[in-house]
Amino acid sequence: MSTGDSFETRFEKIDNLLRDPKSEVNSDCLLDGLDALVYDLDFPALRKNKNIDNFLSRYKDTINKIRDLRMKAEDYEVVKVIGRGAFGEVQLVRHKSTRKVYAMKLLSKFEMIKRSDSAFFWEERDIMAFANSPWVVQLFYAFQDDRYLYMVMEYMPGGDLVNLMSNYDVPEKWARFYTAEVVLALDAIHSMGFIHRDVKPDNMLLDKSGHLKLADFGTCMKMNKEGMVRCDTAVGTPDYISPEVLKSQGGDGYYGRECDWWSVGVFLYEMLVGDTPFYADSLVGTYSKIMNHKNSLTFPDDNDISKEAKNLICAFLTDREVRLGRNGVEEIKRHLFFKNDQWAWETLRDTVAPVVPDLSSDIDTSNFDDLEEDKGDEETFPIPKAFVGNQLPFVGFTYYSNRRYLPSANPSENRSSSNVDKNVQESLQKTIYKLEEQLHNEMQLKDEMEQKCRTSNIKLDKIMKELDEEGNQRRNLESAVSQIEKEKMLLQHRINEYQRKVEQENEKRRNVENEVSTLKDQLEDLRKASQSSQLANEKLTQLQKQLEEANDLLRTESDTAVRLRKSHTEMSKSVSQLESLNRELQERNRMLENSKSQADKDYYQLQAVLEAERRDRGHDSEMIGDLQARITSLQEEVKHLKHNLERVEGERKEAQDMLNHSEKEKNNLEIDLNYKLKSIQQRLEQEVNEHKVTKARLTDKHQSIEEAKSVAMCEMEKKLKEEREAREKAENRVVETEKQCSMLDVDLKQSQQKLEHLTENKERLEDAVKSLTLQLEQESNKRILLQSELKTQAFEADNLKGLEKQMKQEINTLLEAKRLLEFELAQLTKQYRGNEGQMRELQDQLEAEQYFSTLYKTQVKELKEEIEEKNRENLRKIQELQSEKETLSTQLDLAETKAESEQLARGILEEQYFELTQESKKAASRNRQEITDKDHTVSRLEEANNALTKDIELLRKENEELNERMRTAEEEYKLKKEEEISNLKAAFEKNISTERTLKTQAVNKLAEIMNRKDFKIDRKKANTQDLRKKEKENRKLQLELNQEREKFNQMVVKHQKELNDMQAQLVEECTHRNELQMQLASKESDIEQLRAKLLDLSDSTSVASFPSADETDGNLPVGSACIPYLFIFYSSSSRIEGWLSVPNRGNIKRYGWKKQYVVVSSKKMLFYNDEQDKEQSSPSMVLDIDKLFHVRPVTQGDVYRAETEEIPKIFQILYANEGECRKDIEVEPVQQGEKTNFQNHKGHEFIPTLYHFPANCEACAKPLWHVFKPPPALECRRCHVKSHRDHLDKKEDLIPPCKVSYDVTSARDMLLLACPQDEQKKWVTHLVKKIPKKAPSGFVRASPRTLSTRSTANQSFRKVVKNTSGKTS
């Protein structure tokens, strides 16, 4: 600024800076600065500094007054909490005075300072305050106190798009609309120079009309001149983050606005499919899919997504160098996906949204989730011992959209101001607020009327469309009627033809019967006449042949007659149906004509009404002019009243200043007097105390110092007199001050009288204002009524015009259709006459084709018989195998029944033993002889127990033998199957090779014929006869070649069908075998459980067999009591069972968890759907304990989709793919190209990732996470070890080798959820003990010989499924 400017221009510039809301030194910013200083300095430790104390004593009271006058949280009443985040919450509030509804966002100052990110809210405030865009949520006010920042925004009652997607299946039409609105909203933010970086459905809100607005600009960043951003932290939500933003972590991140278009592609995919494109349960999985987006982006087959939508998604979800939108928003707008007939880019905001929220009131929160109360303690700033400046980062945050202080100065008005009461200003402000509220309500009514007008226009469009559809339907029906009539005529003609044929056939039949009868007569005559001659015999045979031929002809004729009768009946039925259809169509035509006549009548009536309304409209326009004149006069009166209000306000301020000055003087005098009185009283009390002390001392001393005492007493009396005189002077001063106070009271009464006079004036003004407001309301109501009537009349007139045009168009179209139909009818009659001759020719051809069809049927029958013979052979083999299988299963059942019977017998014996032991205890005191007898019985029972254990061992051996036999039978069955398949394959290959040789021979033969010299001779020299012969030979060869090709194709189809059938049988056998293996595993676990129970029972009986301590006087053998406890520990530790939850369909976010009953035996881990399946021994999945690799509790990074309460209850197991056995085997495609993003180190396969939630490095035990700026991290996808990336980059030897040594492509992991947290620990500790110390052999050597029989069977089964799926596709 130049110093040569005048003071007025400088002051004007300063004034502009103070007024400018975007200035760093505006009035709100200066007030924030003073407020922050007072907050930060007002602590006991800081007030010890004299300068700080003086500053606070000077400004604290005024700052407190300013705090009361400025906007604060108490000005609003909270309706409901509608959102909660990391820094605070969002409340639905209502302003107490204006009664307007807002959404108020609270941000905790402590949380933002604590997380060292206090700058992100500035972008959010500036974008919402200064955007001035219909696509951005508007900020009305921003204010603060010592704990929170407050942002008062417009309330969006439609909720967010997450709520909409959860309530509706979004069609492509809706997705197009919302994607277009998001594109325009992002373009508005980009045009302001910001990048959003967190575009997701949670930040897309819907207003009351259903249109979209963007919110939550906390991650926004200002672009440089080149439209780029430099950032070294990955910001955003994992599912929607782009690859270039993800790569920026720990490096030099440099990217532009194209990162927002990536998020738009993810959002569009989620709307159409229902899930994000790179969904994974763990954060590492999501990030690895995003980095490998070229291979991991797929579309589901069951969703009908258009090519344009897929093209747009692929154009968004690609590398940033070629991403759509990099060169501007116009190339996105030009995409074919956005082409439609319902809206244009310029009128998108004015069109009706697909979903308009149904709201019951202005505080309807039905589209927001109900949140629980936050019961956690709120953290605040601790009391500092030195200056910290916690409030300084928030200076200048305050913002008001309609700032009212610092008005334009007018010296004449300021000089004429006088004393006025504060109540006058408040009452006038209330009236202004009421008027503003009325204006707001009027605006709302206007919006509602506009919305109703839009909806009525939509309804009208729908009605017009329906009318068009009805007209089209009518035309279609008329065309259908004409078509049906044509078909009816054709059918009638066919019926007549068939009747004629039937009559002809009947005549032929009669002739044939007559001929047969004559032939019979001749035959009888010949038999009688010439029995001896050979000629007669020959004639007889000839006649018999003729008779047989005649009989055959008769049969065929009868069959054709039956067929013709059937066709005749069918034709008659179809004719009746067509007639009924014709009647229905005629009725509909009559109804349409009636509706047309009614519409004509309504049109004429509405035209008459319209003319009447036009007459009334002229009269209403005159009334509107008068009302407008009256409104302008009322507005001038309101301005005059406002002017009076300002004048009265200035007078009130002066009076208030005078009162404040007098009160200050009075208070100062009172303070001085009180201070002097207190000092005098203190001095007097001190003298009295000293006098008492001296008196006590003098009483104890000798009489010789009485004179000194008298002298001291005199001095004390003098001092007392002086003090009394001083007290009298102080009392006089008090009296004088009281006189002054009485004078001030008189002045106060006079000022009160003036105030009463002013209140009377105020009441008069209020009455005038009320009368004026009533008049204004009446006039506004009249105006609104007239406007609504005019709108309805205009709307009805437009409707009538539209109906008139539509009816005219329909009449014209009907006339044209009638002409066309008449023309078509004439042409059809001509065609009908020409078609009669063609029908006769076609009938002859049909008879010839029937003859050929009989020949083909005989050939088909022969082929079917051959196929049936082969199927019978295959069925016979399958039945033999099934019989073998049934015999084995019956043997196994017999063994199980034996074991159960033995167990029952053992139970009976145990019960008897228990009764006997009880009797022995009771009778022990009575008779020792009885005790010895009982001991004998116990010994017998022990012998029986030993015998039973031997039997059980024998049964176990038999069971093992049966298992071995089952395995051998399976192997034999497999070998037989393989041999059959190989034989069939060889046979097929032989057939194919023979067919190929024949084909090649035929081709070679043709080539030889074609390459003969005879063909190369000139055509003129060639003989015509030779050429004809060669042409005949060529035709024959061509026919033979075609026949051979047909045979070859038939053979290929036949063999392919047989191969498919065999593969299907193999699949069924494998599934059946899989189920048997699972049942066998469950039976083995049950047998193991029964053995453990038997051991427990035997141990308890052995313990019970020892005499009690009373009987033996405590003399037990050493070590006898220790043996049973060992067995009990073994039985309890080898088995664990209970309810666990597994991910439903592999997607926790969408489908949640599925409960299963899990049993862990010594060899297997069995999963049952319920306890009934457990009783029936039918598990849904079985895992081999030998194939387990790793068991561990999960962290938040492994299952970031799960709830925070569930994470301590979840654990993960890693196992070999071959160790799994399911009911429904799923063949998963192996993804290629995924290993390229891994970093190998000490057997680990590290994936680069980021942690925004608590996690620690397992190498250095330091934090590995941060909410906004997490450090670069690595996680092994084998053993899930987490580490800083620096350890690997600096080649530090801190990371231990990978504990899991298996191939990830042939291994699986599973998440399991235990209900209590303690249960999770039990399961993990138990399963860790079960893991084998050495890795499974199949994974160490990777040789096919070491694999188990079940794994090979599963692999062969998967190959078969792949082959069948490939061939069927």
Swiss-Prot record:
GO terms for biological process: actin cytoskeleton organization; actomyosin structure organization; aortic valve morphogenesis; apical constriction; bleb assembly; blood vessel diameter maintenance; cellular response to transforming growth factor beta stimulus; cortical actin cytoskeleton organization. The modification Phosphoserine is found at residues 1105, 1108, 1343. Residues 707-946 are annotated as: SHROOM3 binding. Its main location: cytoplasm. A zinc finger (Phorbol-ester/DAG-type) spans 1243-1298. Autophosphorylated on serine and threonine residues. Residues 998-1010 are annotated as: RHOA binding. The keyword Nucleus does not apply. Residues 1133-1332 form the PH domain. Residues 341-409 form the AGC-kinase C-terminal domain. Belongs to the protein kinase superfamily. AGC Ser/Thr protein kinase family. Protein kinase which is a key regulator of the actin cytoskeleton and cell polarity. Involved in regulation of smooth muscle contraction, actin cytoskeleton organization, stress fiber and focal adhesion formation, neurite retraction, cell adhesion and motility via phosphorylation of DAPK3, GFAP, LIMK1, LIMK2, MYL9/MLC2, TPPP, PFN1 and PPP1R12A. Phosphorylates FHOD1 and acts synergistically with it to promote SRC-dependent non-apoptotic plasma membrane blebbing. Phosphorylates JIP3 and regulates the recruitment of JNK to JIP3 upon UVB-induced stress. This is Rho-associated protein kinase 1. The gene is Rock1.
